[in-house]
């Protein structure tokens, strides 16, 4: 069977061809971590992947957004699908041709099998329970979580590294239980500012580095004289347990 489908991806494709060639897509039971410094583009990358997975490929996808509301996620997704900059959507300064693009994009987003849960301060146990329901009732094939640092554990007084370890092990176990890929976003430490991130710089790095099957970093070379002017982002596959 693998021989006959040797030119196809065996997992859920991300829509990024070079990444998919390396990973053959996100595989069932894999725990994938996407890490970056704040404001580098973790959520934007995840939304780009979800656009390809759910909107373009019609693969059922779950998204736990612990940082942004359903409305903000909807606006950003609509901007991506319509290819209309977000500032134009927010300001209302649109041209006549934009309205047809918006209408088409809204229809595609509405019909996409993308299930967004935007409950803030969501407990780990609740995420696990909701994920099970999404798979059982909606046939979800992949889940994204934004982001690890906002998941609430049972013992909030425990040291941060212990809480991250509990979350990491639980999400890895959940991916195996549900037999789907789970993609969790994570911040990296301030040490990575201006440099390419390393596995040791993931928040709570020991457990996440051990539990994750794939770790992908986003890196942008910010110009020193203007921190808001950025170059293209680079995706770094720092770990691939089942890769070559």
Stretches found by the model and what they are:
Residues 35-36:
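The Walker A (P-loop) glycine that initiates the GxxxxGKT/S ATP-binding motif of P-loop NTPases
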């Amino acid at each position: 069977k693998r021989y006959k489908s040797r030119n196809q991806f065996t997992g859920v494709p991300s829509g990024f061809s070079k990444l998919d060639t390396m990973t053959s897509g996100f595989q069932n039971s894999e725990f994938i971590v996407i890490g970056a410094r704040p404001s580098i583009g973790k959520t934007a990358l995840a939304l780009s992947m979800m656009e390809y997975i759910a909107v373009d490929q019609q693969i059922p996808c779950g998204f736990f957004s612990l940082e942004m509301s359903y409305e903000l996620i909807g606006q950003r997704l609509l901007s991506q699908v319509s290819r209309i900059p977000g500032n134009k959507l927010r300001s209302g300064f649109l041209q006549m041709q934009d309205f047809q693009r918006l209408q088409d994009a809204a229809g595609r987003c509405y019909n996409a099998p993308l299930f967004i849960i935007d409950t803030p301060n969501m407990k780990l146990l609740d995420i696990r329970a909701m994920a099970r329901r999404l798979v059982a009732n909606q046939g979800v094939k992949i889940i994204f979580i934004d982001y690890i640092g906002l998941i609430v554990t049972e013992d909030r007084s425990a040291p941060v590294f212990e809480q991250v370890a509990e979350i990491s092990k639980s999400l890895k176990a959940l991916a195996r239980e549900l037999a789907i890929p789970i993609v969790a976003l994570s911040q990296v430490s301030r040490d990575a500012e201006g440099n390419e991130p390393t596995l040791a710089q993931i928040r709570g790095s020991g457990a996440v580095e051990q539990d994750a099957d794939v770790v992908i970093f986003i890196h942008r070379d910010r110009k020193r004289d203007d921190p808001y002017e950025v170059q293209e982002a680079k995706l770094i596959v720092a770990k691939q347990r089942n890769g070559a």
